Amino acid sequence: MEPKYSILLCNQSLEEYQNKIDGWLHKGIKVIWFGDTEDVDNLKHRFADYSKALLLLAYEISIQKKCIIIDGDDKNGFVDKYLEKECPLFNAAQYQVEHCNDKKHIIVQASAGTGKTTVMIDRILFLLHTNPELHLSEVFMITFTNDAADQMNRRLQDALMLRYDLTGEKKYLRWVEEQSQMNISTIHSFAYFMLKEYGIGESFTKNLSIRSFQFERKELIKDVIDDTIDTNSNVRNQLGVPFYRANSMVNDFWNGFSKLGISHRDIGKMNWGKAIDTGSEPFQKVMTGILNRLDDEYFDIKRKNEAISIDDIMRDLQEVLQSEVLPKPDITMKYLFIDEFQDSDLSQIMVSCLMVKLLNPCLFVVGDVKQSIYRFRGANDQAFYVLKHDMSELHINRPEEFTLVNNYRTSASVLERMDDYFEVWGRMGRLQYDKPVVPFNQDPGRIRMIHGEKNEQADEQIARIASRELDALIDRVENSEDEADEKTRVVMLTRTNRELSQLASTLRRNRIPAVIRRDGSFYASETVRDFYIMVSSFLFCDEPKYIFNYLLTPYAGEIDRMNLNDMEWLHGDYENLVSYLDNYLEQTNWKKYHKDLRLRPVLAVLKDILDSESVIDNYILNSKAKMKDDGWEENRIQAATYTNALQYQANLEKLMDILQKNLGGDKVSIYDVYKFLKLNVSTNREESEAEVVTNEEQTKSLYKSILCMTVHKAKGLEFDTVIIPYTNRTFPTWEKTEILIDPIGRKVGWNYTGDTEKKNKRWKYPAMSNSLYKELKEIDTESTKREETRILYVAMTRAIHNLICIVPDSKNEKTWASLIEEVGIDYE
């Protein structure tokens, strides 16, 4: 029997198989060889290109057992019995996942750095090779971010093109062409697609749009509460709080169910306990009485508007898929892959099961419970348990389960020291850490715990360490034959955006080049600010302050330096200021563009400005001049302006795309552009800066600046050196106005902390709660501690060669510092 995808040969005659191996490799068949040292060396030398591409895997083995396994058909369990024990370099678990029966559902637990993306790509290649009728359009893959979807697309395409380059087999080109039809998307894009296919039974059509519905939700809450109470009686007595406060609390509490993905039908099955006192009874009664009605009427609003909201799109899809009337969609789904499954909420888990039930695909989910760090979005750290429970309830075949433990990312010396921490946290019940991973990276590395200094010395210490590590990395790269890539970076990771802002200020103050990646910062970026200033100058051309600001932007180009002392002598006289600034304005093309804006389409003129003016070059010149004035060293000026200019350029391209999508058309005025920018600059804190896509040459220079981001932003990434500068932040476990929901136990606890009058601090509105809050708060506190431990785990496992944690003395057990101290610290 000839192999379709792979052949495993153990202790076979190389003389007998050498020509066959040559033929298999040239057809794209993976060959896995186990033999003596001489045979292994011969194969790796003769088929070096295939070995480098991992199409040939050759391992030394001491046992004399013989075996041939074709396409993973290991009926006698040879891999488990012998190869896993006798050849640690062979990744038996990855082999078994890759070659698992194509009719099986699969769950893969993959710790950080164990190659989960690789195993997903290899699994798809196995399915393509062994199922001639399979098309990539029948393979669906769900990721949790657009970046992850893009990366998966790139990795699959690279794998197919590499095989084509090595073999010349046309099937790989055909699969590359088919790849554009493969459904790799984020969870929300997938839900939107499925709602358009299945939603007709609930009066949704394929014209379904996406809206926020924030206004409609607030109005609905107001109307339902208003309809519930007697307007002729005291409102506060019926609600326990004023109407406006009840409105806000109901909105927050209702959102709590949406966030966790609790379905509409399950909301009505929740146990709310009892009010703890007579003062809490009114709100308890209102809340339990209106929740189902809110959900019903909100769903009707969405139906009437033929629109859904991103916030509860998965709940809506679950509701649709569980309805009695389901259309038969024109979808063929043979395989459904879900990445980062530990970040799933209840509705996402149920939807994946319902898709299996309705369309009969084989399910493949991969994730790591130790990296479940999106609890604030509703992620369930018991996602794999819930999945198996839901599959059983729906009578879906039991999945095959695998665990990947071979770590290819982190230096063995670093990983072995990390394991001391992870093992203790596992014994403490803070981390699900069953057994240590096996390190395969033998590069030198180091983990350092540095005693944190106090108060104002803390920032200086952080800057010293950052500067030292940056210089050390630059020195290593410039004295190495290896070229730098996107992983060759010093990265500083923070827990919160507030810490990230503090870190950015510290590095800037100490003249250290740094790139800050934060969510929602696009409309606060230099790029948008400068563009907004330019647009404002055209609209308010008679006001000196707008012209002055314009002259400071890269759009003004190289002009004579303005003297602020000269301007002060004008004492704010309007005519003199206009005349003074006009001298500088004449050195630019501003007046030409101002005239063009009256004669030509606005967006066309703005595009001309970007094409004609050397905006990026001017930005670099301005930045260098300012840094030089501020005392920066020349090499750090070069590093900072290089990375900042790349980001500026990427943001500029993104801004023009946004303007074109939102304001495209000949009738757009400069005022429309100004109004759009003003609104978003003032309110939009969700749009993130553009992803900088660099070519190979550009990537080689990125290592000269530090990269700063939150741990959540860094998830899935890896870097040469990781610094964790802040470990003394207290975990948020205090009581507050909140709703706590146990979705598995179906319990609900709620609490209102009350309001005090500012002057005399007396209670204006007393605290309220229900009987389950204390119990659920204790559970929530422990859950918070476990999640914070997982976040620290994610931060630490981003490191490849070096990990530095700054650990100050901590008297509070609810900090990262205390977690580290639990294990013991050998301070540097």
Name every feature range the model reports, one short phrase each.
Residues 486, 535-794, 798:
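Conserved helicase C-terminal RecA-like lobe
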Residues 18, 42-59, 64-69, 744-769, ...:
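Helicase C-terminal subdomain and adjacent C-terminal extension
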Residues 2-4, 16, 30-45, 53-154, ...:
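Conserved motor-region signature of P-loop NTPase helicases/translocases
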Residues 28, 36-60, 138, 217-307, ...:
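Conserved ATP-driven helicase/translocase motor core recognized via long
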Residues 35-37, 55, 137-246, 382-386:
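Conserved P-loop NTPase-based nucleic-acid remodeling module centered on helicase motor cores
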